[in-house]
Every structure is written in structure tokens, then in C-alpha cells.
């Protein structure tokens, strides 16, 4: 695996040829249909959900596709969580102990909201992708770093985004369920599902 560190600079300007070349022989329709059968499924039984999404699929790529497709079509982005976290982290950027305490408290809130409401921010998306992947025997990592927009603004400081690296058939790929799932309508501050496959399995 590439040497990913906390200070990864993640830009989505990468070529996406690997996705098409490595998986062009796989029809993901079955995986997506299975994911659709579990629409609205609770997160109270993650092993059961992982089994349901993967048990009828043979390849690692298809199993991961079912997981990724389910997460990006069933987990809502929460603008309030994102805004509060960004504001607090900026305020505490020069206070390591205060930032640590905030992170500990906020992380608990994020996971409670994810479990009960299926709403989250990038941390929750990446966590859920990792847990479900590991439950079906796939190696998956969470990567913390910077969103591409912050690179352009030259405002690097505390890492502010999380995504995943997934190992399929011995090869590592990047994916970002947060950006695949949709966007926040800034006129209403409500999340709109709008799946974008560009962030699925990037080399």
C-alpha cells in the first residue's frame, strides 16, 4: 500500500482509467440491485447488513460495490455537523488539548447520529465503509487529509476530510463516499442525493 499519512493531499484531478481498465469485465448491476433491496436498512445490525449486501456476490469488487452503493444511497450528509466541526476546529487550531477534547466529544455525537438517523459527515461515511468492508473480509483504511478545495485556497492546517483506501484483488484504490453521495443545497441546507461514480475506485 502506498505510504498514506495524516497529511495526505488528496486531489480528484487524478485520471480514472484504472477503474475502467481493472473492472470493465465486471457487471455491477447485480451488486447495485442487492443494495437497492436494503434501502432504508437500519444500522443497528452491521454484521447482518454486511452479510445481506455481500453473500450472493463472488468477487471482491462486486462485494465492495454493493457496500459502497448502499452507503452512498442511504446515508445523508449533515451540513450542521460539518459546519459545527469546521468552526470548532478553526477556533481550537492553536489549542491542542482543547482540540483533542472537542474531537473526542464530537466523534461520539457523530457516531450516535449515524447509527440512529443515518446522517453524518465525511468521518462517518469513511467509518461505515471501513466497518462494512472489513465485515465481508476486505482490507480497508480510513485516510485523513485535505479536500481539494482547501488546496486551491492554500488554507492547509488541520486535516479536514476523510475518505477510504480499499484493497481489491491485491491492489489499492481510493474512494470517497462523501463526495459520491450527493451535496448540500445551500438555499435550504438540506442534503440532496446525487450519486457521482467518479469517486469510486480511483487508483
What role is predicted for each listed range?
Residues 1-21:
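Bacterial Sec-dependent N-terminal signal peptides
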Residues 7, 78-79, 181:
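Hydrophobic positions within alpha-helical membrane elements
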Residues 7, 56, 153-155:
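Residues embedded in well-ordered secondary-structure elements
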Residues 12, 43, 64, 122-126, ...:
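Short alpha-helical patches at coil-to-helix transitions and adjacent helical residues
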Residues 12, 71, 75-79, 136-140, ...:
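A generic secondary-structure signal for well-formed alpha-helical elements
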Residues 20-120:
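Secondary-structure boundary elements
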Residues 124-202:
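Hydrophobic/aromatic-rich core segments of domains that either
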Amino acid at each position: 500500500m502506498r505510504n498514506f499519512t495524516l497529511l495526505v493531499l488528496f486531489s480528484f484531478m487524478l485520471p480514472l482509467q484504472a477503474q475502467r481498465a481493472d473492472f470493465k469485465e465486471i457487471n455491477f448491476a447485480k451488486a447495485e440491485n442487492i443494495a437497492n433491496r436494503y434501502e432504508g436498512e437500519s444500522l443497528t445490525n452491521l454484521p447482518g447488513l454486511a452479510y445481506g449486501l455481500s453473500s450472493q456476490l463472488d468477487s471482491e469488487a462486486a462485494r465492495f460495490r454493493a457496500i459502497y452503493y448502499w452507503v452512498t444511497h442511504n446515508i445523508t450528509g449533515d451540513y450542521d455537523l460539518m459546519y459545527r466541526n469546521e468552526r470548532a476546529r478553526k477556533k481550537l487550531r492553536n489549542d491542542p488539548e482543547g482540540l483533542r477534547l472537542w474531537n473526542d466529544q464530537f466523534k461520539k455525537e457523530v457516531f450516535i447520529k449515524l447509527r440512529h438517523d443515518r446522517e453524518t459527515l465525511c468521518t462517518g461515511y469513511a467509518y461505515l465503509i471501513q466497518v462494512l468492508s472489513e465485515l465481508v473480509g476486505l482490507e480497508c483504511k480510513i485516510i485523513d487529509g485535505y479536500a481539494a478545495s482547501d488546496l486551491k485556497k492554500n488554507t492547509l492546517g488541520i486535516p479536514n476530510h476523510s475518505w477510504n483506501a480499499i484493497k481489491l484483488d491485491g491492489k489499492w484504490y481510493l474512494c470517497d463516499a462523501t463526495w459520491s453521495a450527493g451535496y448540500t443545497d445551500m438555499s435550504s441546507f438540506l442534503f440532496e442525493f446525487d450519486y457521482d461514480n467518479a469517486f469510486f475506485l480511483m487508483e
